[in-house]
């Protein structure tokens, strides 16, 4: 009787794992046709100053989107650092995630994307190509539109840094 229960339990586990695998593989590269918020960046100095405050403070952009640990420490100490990305975080069995270049560089940064694409990424986690990104670690979906505009306006005001970073690697 115990052997029969264990076999049934094992069958349920195998079917569950198979179902999870099929779900993930069928939705992994799914394209989302979800429009970004109809927002536009600003060149107003007060908006950019608000963006700088958010990027270097509550939004924690400088805690990850730097090139290494030394820059993280410098940013946390109040120094200005380039938000050129490149820090790789090991995500255990999921794979690894490398932070993106947030400077307005047209080759490797956000300069190659429209405002709508950036806002959509921040608000909904949808990449410019329409695929889902790794779940965002910061809750930008709750951020007020005015603050989203301020953050991206500040990022657009930074000097561009051409710094190509690795793509995320999923296992």
Task: For each feature predicted by the language model, list its residue ranges.
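Short, low-complexity cationic-aromatic patches
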Residues: 55, 93-95, 108-115, 143-145
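Flexible coil segments in periplasmic/lumen-exposed cytochrome c-class electron-transfer proteins
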Residues: 26-38, 67-96, 128-171
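Electrostatic cytochrome c docking/interface patches
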Residues: 32-56
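The canonical Cys-X-X-Cys-His
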Residues: 51, 58-68, 118, 151, ...
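A structural feature that tracks compact, well-ordered secondary-structure segments
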Residues: 103-113, 120-126, 139-141, 154, ...
């Amino acid at each position: 009787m115990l052997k029969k229960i264990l076999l049934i339990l094992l069958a349920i586990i195998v079917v569950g794992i198979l179902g999870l695998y099929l779900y993930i593989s069928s939705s992994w590269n799914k394209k989302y046709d979800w429009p970004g918020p109809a927002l536009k960046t600003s060149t107003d100095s007060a908006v950019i100053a608000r963006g700088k405050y958010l990027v270097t403070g509550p939004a924690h952009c400088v805690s990850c989107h730097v090139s290494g640990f030394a820059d993280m420490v410098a940013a946390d100490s109040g120094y200005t650092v380039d938000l050129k990305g490149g820090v790789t975080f090991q995500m255990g069995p999921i794979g690894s995630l490398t932070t993106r270049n947030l400077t307005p560089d047209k080759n490797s940064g956000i300069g190659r994307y429209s405002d709508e694409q950036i806002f959509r990424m921040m608000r909904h986690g949808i990449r410019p190509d329409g695929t889902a990104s790794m779940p965002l670690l910061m809750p930008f979906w709750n951020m007020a539109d005015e603050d989203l505009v301020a953050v991206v306006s500040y990022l657009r005001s930074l000097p561009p840094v051409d710094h190509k970073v690795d793509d995320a690697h999923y296992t």
